Amino acid sequence: MSDTSHLLKHLVGYVESRERIAEREKTGSDFSEDKGKNSAQIAKLHPKRLQLEVAEVTQETPSTKTFRLKSAHGELPPFQAGQYINLFVTIDGVETARPYAISSCPSHRDYYDLTVKIVEGGFVTNYLLNKVEPGQQFSATSPMGTFYYNPIIHGKKLVFLAGGSGGAPARAMIESVLNRGVDAEFYLVYGNSFENDVIFQDTFQALAAKHDNFHLTEVISRPSEGFDGLRGHLNAERITEAVGSVEDAMFYVCGPTPFNEYCKEQLVSLGVKDKRIRIECNGPPKQPSALEHWPAGADEQAMVTVKVRGKGEFKAQVGEPLLNSLERNGYFVENACRSGECSLCRVKVMEGEVFNAPESKLRKSDATFGWVHSCVAFPTTDIEILF
């Protein structure tokens, strides 16, 4: 076996750790006095639950508010720009949760900003916009998610394609890397419906004026008469006009699910490889029946019976994610991303059939043993589940 001791000496903190161990051994210590310290530190950095209080509410645009959340008890854990927290709420007796990207920079350690845009029929989003005021408290997960910039492997040409609410994670990521002086070229191609409803427009324009390596392109799809800016959608032609060559660029796509899907199609048509496209998780598909492999004859509006082994049963709509149906009927399942990524909402299908959306990050063994991610699973027949 090769001698690796000379390599270990170059690891940061290795020599100091060995010296501390040697000192402890001289006193006959068995290190029991340190038991639990690592667990305590991990719990501090990654607590299972946070208790947050709304400190401020800011009206950003006619359709959007920013909620500044501070810890109700102690410090907030650090996060990577682009990550989200899952906010738990109780609305009309229904316990549920939704993930929201943190729109503030990680350098602001005493608060998280959540920027929320109105959604047609949005159960939680519209509750936040219409009902929540300073002083209210919420439970939330710690920051999580994989949608963030990696300086080691993402290269030096970073392109953000943002639509509407996608301005929230884009703002945190772009402001963070620019403030750190990262040696790279940054592009933001930002699509919105109306010119008077652009989230963080002043912030992005100020950053573009201040930093020569940040290039901003704004596009409006439903402009008013007389609007003299760029019109249309973020199609392949618009993307290449804004960023030039797509070769070696890393793309970050953030916005509503239809926007993300459309942008990916455009990037693929330009020859961008999957590994150069990072997409923010943003909820289950709105119309699962339009997806490939949806069962022939399955009607989104149909009702099926969901039996929860040992707990009861209820009626659920085929076109509604199983997790949503469970929550509406009083069953709590741990969850975070609600996009098929984190796997916290796994349930086991004992009988019946479900449709798993492409977002579901299932393993081969999951299919073998019947596990599904309930946030992106749709019951297409009567089913029995276990969790």
Regions flagged by a language model, labelled:
Residues 1-31:
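Helix-rich terminal scaffold detector
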Residues 1-13, 121-307:
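FNR/FR-type flavoprotein reductase catalytic core
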Residues 300-334, 338:
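C-terminal accessory/binding modules appended to enzymatic or scaffolding proteins
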Residues 36-137, 141, 156, 192-194, ...:
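Ferredoxin-reductase
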Residues 312, 325-329, 334, 344-387:
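Iron-sulfur (Fe-S) cluster-binding segments and ferredoxin-like electron-carrier domains
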Residues 116, 161-162, 192, 254-255, ...:
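Small/polar loops that bind or transfer phosphate-bearing groups
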Residues 106-111, 152-156, 378-387:
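Ligand-binding loop in jelly-roll beta-barrel domains
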